[in-house]
Amino acid sequence: MAIQKVSNKDLSRKDKRRFNIESKVNKIYQNFYSERDNQYKDRLTALQTDLTSLHQGDNGQYARQVRDLEEERDLELVRLRLFEEYRVSRSGIEFQEDIEKAKAEHEKLIKLCKERLYSSIEQKIKKLQEERLLMDVANVHSYAMNYSRPQYQKNTRSHTVSGWDSSSNEYGRDTANESATDTGAGNDRRTLRRRNASKDTRGNNNNQDESDFQTGNGSGSNGHGSRQGSQFPHFNNLTYKSGMNSDSDFLQGINEGTDLYAFLFGEKNPKDNANGNEKKKNRGAQRYSTKTAPPLQSLKPDEVTEDISLIRELTGQPPAPFRLRSD
């Protein structure tokens, strides 16, 4: 019985609460329904007032919002302007940096090209100097005169091969080219070439001087004896020391070859001048007081190159660093 009483009491409380809520809702509904027209009229009046104020520009809230939007717009425009100016200035700075970088690279490239060009030129100069040194050495070995030898005449060609002696040389020691001349047939062409060049440049008068110089003719058939003594001081001393026998042997060797005598002195009868030369031999060493040695003819670059190649080949050295010209 007690449990039923409690449940009835609880049910009564729930019903009472629900009843109160329903009564409140009904009251609100009735109030709204009764004041519905007034609410709509007030709302419509407020909207019309706002529209009128908006059209007239008297609405403060609307004006404030418009002003805020304008300020925000101006701020964005200023920001955009500053950004454009920044981009323009930055582009100019980057452009100048690119120009400076390009100039630096250009100068660096020019410097590198100059260094390589200078290096190439220096290498070429060094190579040409080496070639010139080799040519000078070849010329010295071919044409230098050694005045320390007590005898002026030197036979570089055998009597059994050609039947006559080659041109005189003042060197007492054989150089590399002289030994090559005695052993190699290729140098015979060079000796003849030098002899022909000397003959073409000096002419008949120089040949007569050479005849006087080699045979010991003091006065000469053309009157050249007055200037022979001073032009060959070294040969004067050497001839004075060597005596008359060497001159006689040399003259006899030349007289044995008629072609050689005609080639050297331009005369076909070597016996005609032999007696006159023997008579004039006893005048002493003063006949060489004024005569100088004939000028040596320089070789052409191709001839020097051939001589150097032949010297290297005979001495067992490697080939020259320069090449022969091919016409």
Curated annotation (Swiss-Prot):
<keyword id="KW-0805">Transcription regulation</keyword>
<dbReference type="GO" id="GO:0006334">
    <property type="term" value="P:nucleosome assembly"/>
</dbReference>
<comment type="similarity">
    <text>Belongs to the SDS3 family.</text>
</comment>
<feature type="modified residue" description="Phosphoserine">
    <location>
        <position position="211"/>
    </location>
</feature>
<dbReference type="GO" id="GO:0070210">
    <property type="term" value="C:Rpd3L-Expanded complex"/>
</dbReference>
<keyword id="KW-0678">Repressor</keyword>
<dbReference type="GO" id="GO:0033698">
    <property type="term" value="C:Rpd3L complex"/>
</dbReference>
<protein>
    <recommendedName>
        <fullName>Transcriptional regulatory protein SDS3</fullName>
    </recommendedName>
</protein>
<feature type="region of interest" description="Disordered">
    <location>
        <begin position="268"/>
        <end position="299"/>
    </location>
</feature>
<dbReference type="GO" id="GO:0005829">
    <property type="term" value="C:cytosol"/>
</dbReference>
<dbReference type="GO" id="GO:0006357">
    <property type="term" value="P:regulation of transcription by RNA polymerase II"/>
</dbReference>
<dbReference type="GO" id="GO:0070822">
    <property type="term" value="C:Sin3-type complex"/>
</dbReference>
<keyword id="KW-0804">Transcription</keyword>
<feature type="modified residue" description="Phosphoserine">
    <location>
        <position position="166"/>
    </location>
</feature>
<dbReference type="InterPro" id="IPR013907">
    <property type="entry name" value="Sds3"/>
</dbReference>
<dbReference type="GO" id="GO:0034605">
    <property type="term" value="P:cellular response to heat"/>
</dbReference>
<dbReference type="GO" id="GO:2000217">
    <property type="term" value="P:regulation of invasive growth in response to glucose limitation"/>
</dbReference>
<dbReference type="GO" id="GO:0061188">
    <property type="term" value="P:negative regulation of rDNA heterochromatin formation"/>
</dbReference>
<dbReference type="GO" id="GO:0031507">
    <property type="term" value="P:heterochromatin formation"/>
</dbReference>
<feature type="coiled-coil region">
    <location>
        <begin position="61"/>
        <end position="135"/>
    </location>
</feature>
<dbReference type="GO" id="GO:0045944">
    <property type="term" value="P:positive regulation of transcription by RNA polymerase II"/>
</dbReference>
<keyword id="KW-0539">Nucleus</keyword>
<feature type="compositionally biased region" description="Polar residues">
    <location>
        <begin position="151"/>
        <end position="170"/>
    </location>
</feature>
<comment type="subunit">
    <text>Component of the RPD3C(L) complex composed of at least ASH1, CTI6, DEP1, PHO23, RPD3, RXT2, RXT3, SAP30, SDS3, SIN3, UME1 and UME6.</text>
</comment>
<comment type="function">
    <text>Component of the RPD3C(L) histone deacetylase complex (HDAC) responsible for the deacetylation of lysine residues on the N-terminal part of the core histones (H2A, H2B, H3 and H4). Histone deacetylation gives a tag for epigenetic repression and plays an important role in transcriptional regulation, cell cycle progression and developmental events. SDS3 is required for the HDAC activity of the complex and for the RPD3-SIN3 association.</text>
</comment>
<feature type="region of interest" description="Disordered">
    <location>
        <begin position="151"/>
        <end position="240"/>
    </location>
</feature>
<keyword id="KW-0156">Chromatin regulator</keyword>
<keyword id="KW-0175">Coiled coil</keyword>
<dbReference type="GO" id="GO:0000122">
    <property type="term" value="P:negative regulation of transcription by RNA polymerase II"/>
</dbReference>
<keyword id="KW-0597">Phosphoprotein</keyword>
<dbReference type="GO" id="GO:0043709">
    <property type="term" value="P:cell adhesion involved in single-species biofilm formation"/>
</dbReference>
<dbReference type="GO" id="GO:0005634">
    <property type="term" value="C:nucleus"/>
</dbReference>
<dbReference type="GO" id="GO:0042826">
    <property type="term" value="F:histone deacetylase binding"/>
</dbReference>
<dbReference type="GO" id="GO:0061186">
    <property type="term" value="P:negative regulation of silent mating-type cassette heterochromatin formation"/>
</dbReference>
<dbReference type="Pfam" id="PF08598">
    <property type="entry name" value="Sds3"/>
</dbReference>
